[in-house]
Structure formats: C-alpha cells, structure tokens
A protein has these predicted regions:
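Extracellular glycoside hydrolase catalytic/binding regions
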Residues: 1-130
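Aromatic-rich peripheral "rim/lid" segments of glycoside hydrolase catalytic domains that contact
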Residues: 110-188
Length: 188
C-alpha cells in the first residue's frame, strides 16, 4: 500500500523545503475557491457557518454569478496552482494523486442548481493535471459520488473526463530511473 498524506496546503513549495522522502506520492487537494487566499469564498461571504443551510444559500445566490463575471481570472488561478504543483512534484520526484479537487469545495445537489460552471472548472482542472504528466491518479471533481445527481446525469461528460485521464502520458521524471515511482506504478 502506498504511503502518502493528503495535503491542501497553499504553499506547495513546502514539498521542496521539508524532507518528504518517506512518502510514495503526494495526494494534494486543489480547489479554485481556495486560491489567492480564499478570494472566491471571501467574495461569496462563505467563511462562517460552513455546512449550515445559510452558508449554502450564499453559495447558491452568489457563486455562479461571481464565477461567470470573470471566468478567465478564476480559471487562471486554478491552472496556475495545478501547474505549480506539478512542477514542484517533478523537482522532488514524486507522483501526484488528487482525490478532492478543482472547482468549488461545497455545492449541494439542490433542485434547479446549474452544474455547468462547476463541470467547466472540473474539466479544466482534470485536463490541466493530465497535461503535466505528474498525476498518476486524478479525480474529476469533489462530486464524484453518485449522490450528486447534478454531476452524474451527464454521462458523456464523465466518459470524456475518463478518456482524458486514461490517455494521459506520465512524465519521464516518474517513469524513468525513479525507484519510488516505479514501485508505486507497479501497485496501481
């Protein structure tokens, strides 16, 4: 069984500063909403009462509009963090897995909520992670469970994301002369 620790720290350079040689891989959580010091959630005013109905109502009322007002800005925050995480992982020779990721952390499957903007960010995150070549395991979103009907009803989207993940080529830094990564890849 691979030895890892799940991280969602903002400063991925810590992987370079701290001895992580005992880890087989980094399981790093990355969400757009946490970038730039939680800027998105601050603008939504989603800081107190997480998991309370009032907090979710703020998300429903504000989040999609906020994203759609500056989609390229929010997308760049996400892709910059994914690329940086990939670069740092490459420097220290550790593959990446992400199991919680990409767009928004908390989104309810309430009636009539639009999932298109969430899927847009999640597709971007999935594609960007795959392109780095450093991810050996990629979740498509924070909403991979079938209880999220809003995500699961789009079978084609999931098939497209799965095809991207399965066809992603791994970087030579984890496939050639990397004993730790080779051991891990053999187990996967």
């Amino acid at each position: 069984m691979p030895f890892l620790f799940s991280f969602d720290c903002w400063d991925v350079h810590k992987y370079e500063e701290v001895d992580t040689s005992f880890l087989d891989l980094f399981e790093h959580h990355i969400w757009m909403v946490h970038q730039n010091n939680n800027e998105f959630y601050k603008k939504v005013d989603y800081k107190d009462g997480q998991f309370l109905p009032e907090a979710y109502k703020k998300v429903v009322k504000v989040a999609e509009k906020l994203y759609k007002a500056k989609p390229l800005y929010w997308q760049k925050l996400l892709t910059d963090k994914i690329k940086l995480t990939g670069e740092v992982a490459k420097k220290v020779g550790r593959p990446l897995v992400t199991t919680e990721c990409w767009g928004i952390v908390d989104y309810k499957d309430w009636p009539l909520l639009n999932w298109d903007w969430v899927k847009e960010l999640c597709a971007l995150g999935t594609v960007t992670a795959a392109q780095t070549g450093m991810w050996v395991g990629i979740a498509t979103s924070n909403f991979c469970g079938p209880q999220f009907v809003g995500m699961w009803r789009d079978v084609k989207w999931h098939q497209e994301m799965t095809a991207i993940i399965k066809s992603a080529e791994l970087d030579e830094s984890i496939t050639i002369n990397n004993e730790i990564a080779a051991k891990l890849l053999k187990r996967l």
